[in-house]
């Protein structure tokens, strides 16, 4: 069984959810976070006010940031090196798929991913599984809607789940 998890989180610039304005990645091996990656991304699309207020990311923030194809060239080996994990994975995986498609990049994960929301509902029924609530439950520091903090927090939650909840 593979014991390498690539935990990631994306932030989006607008309601279309087909571009990425920031990505955070935390690598978990043998029950420990062994590496972290973060980058702002120029989405080459306008920002919605709501998304900018939520994430603190806007056109000025990403002015010198690389576009997604440049980032992808750097992170694809990492994203292909383990089981993908995200909190509310349907959203993050969906955004990643749409972004890859928008740039005509052919890539598919080698194995099905893991959603820590779904995992948590089976391990800890009857409580809220929103990221901030799970961080409160486990005492994990979180700067919510910051891709690097969200990916690290999700990785910590995954580790707690693997330890037995």
Residue ranges of model-derived segments:
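Conserved non-catalytic scaffold segment of RNase H-like nuclease domains
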Residues: 1-111, 125-145
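Short secondary-structure boundary/hinge segments and terminal tails
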Residues: 70, 118, 151-153
């Amino acid at each position: 069984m593979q014991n390498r998890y690539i935990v990631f989180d994306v932030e989006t610039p607008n309601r279309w959810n087909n571009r990425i304005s920031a990505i955070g990645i935390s690598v978990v091996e043998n029950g420990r976070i062994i590496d972290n990656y973060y980058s702002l991304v120029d989405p080459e699309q306008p920002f919605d006010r709501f998304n900018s207020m939520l994430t603190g990311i806007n056109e000025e923030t990403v002015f010198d940031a690389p576009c997604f194809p440049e980032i992808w060239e750097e992170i694809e080996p990492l994203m292909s090196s383990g089981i993908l994990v995200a909190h509310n994975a349907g959203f993050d995986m969906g955004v990643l798929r749409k972004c890859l498609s928008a740039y005509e990049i052919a890539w598919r994960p080698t194995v099905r991913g893991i959603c820590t929301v779904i995992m948590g509902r089976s391990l800890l029924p009857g409580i809220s599984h929103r990221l901030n609530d799970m961080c409160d439950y486990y005492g994990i520091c979180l700067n919510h809607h910051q891709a690097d903090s969200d990916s690290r927090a999700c990785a910590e939650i995954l580790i707690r789940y693997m330890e037995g909840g």
